[in-house]
C-alpha cells in the first residue's frame, strides 16, 4: 500500500561505539559490580539509517567513521543492511563513544559520552551537497549537530524543496537551533526534551495533559508537526492542520531501552515520507521501537 522502496531518504548524523554494561544485580556506584559488557555500533544517525533500511528502503547516510579500528566494520554492517555509505568519510578517531550502565529493568542508570567531531561533513556538503540532495525525497537529521552542518543542510533542503525531519540527542544544544526546528516538516523529541523546549513542566503529565500542552505550545512554533514520546505511555502528536492524537505503546518486557527513540523516529519519518497518515506513522514507529526494546541491539530488523 505504501511505497517504501522507491524513496530516497538522506540521513545526516553521528556514529558511535556504544559500550554497554549490564550489572548482574543492583548497580552500586561506589562498589564493585559484576556483570557483562557488550560493544554495539551506535549513534543516533547511524541507528536511524539502519532502522530505515530495516523497512526495505536504501537510505543515504552522510557521516564520519573511523579510518582504523571499528570503522570498516561499521561501514560494512550498514552496507549489508541496505544503507548507502558513499558519503561517509573515514578519519582517524572519527567515531564517538558512549559508555552506559543499564539497570536490571532495561533503563539507563548512568552514562558518559565523547562527542564526535563532524565538522568535515560541512566540507563534504560544500563539495557534493547538490549531488546528494538534488533527487532526495526527504532528509532526516540530528538538529544538534554542528551549526556549520545544520545550516548547509537546510540551505540545500530549501534549494531543492526537500522536507526535513528532525530529531535530537542533546536539547541543550538544540535550543540554539530553534530557527531550524521551526523549518522541520516534523520534529520528534521525548517528554523531558519537550519540557525544555516549551519551558514548561512536563514531568508526570498524563498523555491527555501532554497532548493539551503540545497543541497549545505548537502555536509558538512554525514546524508543521511535532511528536512527543512518553516512554511507556506511548506518544502524542499535533500538526498545524489541527490533526492531533495519542498513540499508545505496546505492553512488552523491556530488555534494553537504548535505541528505541531512534527507531521510533525512523518509523515515523519513513511513514510520513511515504504518505502515511500521522497516526499510522506513529504506530509504525511504536512497533519498531517495541522490537528494539526487546533486545540488546540498537536497531530494528524486520522478521
What are these regions (language model features)?
Residues 1-64, 69-80, 254:
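Glycine-rich phosphate/adenosyl-contacting loop at the front of the ribokinase-like
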Residues 138-209, 233-235:
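Conserved beta-alpha-beta core of the PfkB/ribokinase-like small-molecule kinase fold
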Amino acid at each position: 500500500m505504501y511505497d517504501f522502496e522507491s524513496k530516497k531518504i538522506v540521513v545526516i548524523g553521528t556514529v558511535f561505539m556504544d559500550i554497554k554494561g549490564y550489572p548482574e544485580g543492583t548497580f552500586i556506584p561506589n562498589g564493585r559490580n559484576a556483570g557483562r559488557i557488550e560493544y554495539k555500533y551506535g549513534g543516533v544517525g547511524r541507528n536511524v539509517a539502519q532502522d530505515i533500511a530495516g523497512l526495505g528502503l536504501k537510505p543515504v547516510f552522510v557521516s564520519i567513521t573511523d579510518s582504523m579500528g571499528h570503522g570498516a566494520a561499521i561501514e560494512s554492517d550498514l552496507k549489508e543492511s541496505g544503507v548507502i555509505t558513499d558519503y561517509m568519510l573515514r578519519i582517524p578517531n572519527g567515531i564517538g563513544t558512549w559508555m552506559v550502565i543499564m539497570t536490571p529493568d532495561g533503563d539507563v542508570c548512568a552514562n558518559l559520552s565523547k562527542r564526535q567531531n563532524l565538522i568535515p561533513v560541512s566540507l563534504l556538503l560544500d563539495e557534493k551537497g547538490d549531488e546528494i540532495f538534488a533527487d532526495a525525497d526527504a532528509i532526516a537529521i540530528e538538529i544538534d549537530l554542528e551549526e556549520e552542518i545544520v545550516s548547509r543542510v537546510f540551505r540545500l533542503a530549501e534549494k531543492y524543496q526537500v522536507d526535513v525531519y528532525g530529531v535530537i540527542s542533546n536539547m541543550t544544544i538544540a535550543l540554539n537551533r530553534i530557527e531550524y526546528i521551526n523549518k522541520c516538516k516534523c520534529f520528534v523529541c521525548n517528554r523531558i526534551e519537550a519540557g525544555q523546549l516549551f519551558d514548561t513542566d512536563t514531568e508526570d503529565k498524563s498523555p491527555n495533559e501532554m497532548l493539551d500542552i503540545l497543541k497549545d505550545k505548537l502555536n509558538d512554533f512554525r514546524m508543521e508537526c511535532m511528536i512527543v514520546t512518553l516512554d511507556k505511555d506511548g506518544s502524542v502528536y499535533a500538526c498545524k492542520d489541527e490533526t492531533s492524537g495519542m498513540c499508545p505503546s505496546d505492553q512488552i518486557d523491556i530488555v534494553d531501552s537504548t535505541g528505541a527513540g531512534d527507531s521510533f523516529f525512523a518509523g515515523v519519518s519513513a511513514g510520513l515520507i511515504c504518505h502515511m497518515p500521522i497516526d499510522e506513522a506513529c504506530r509504525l514507529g511504536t512497533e519498531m521501537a517495541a522490537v528494539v526494546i526487546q533486545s540488546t541491539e540498537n536497531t530494528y530488523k524486520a522478521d
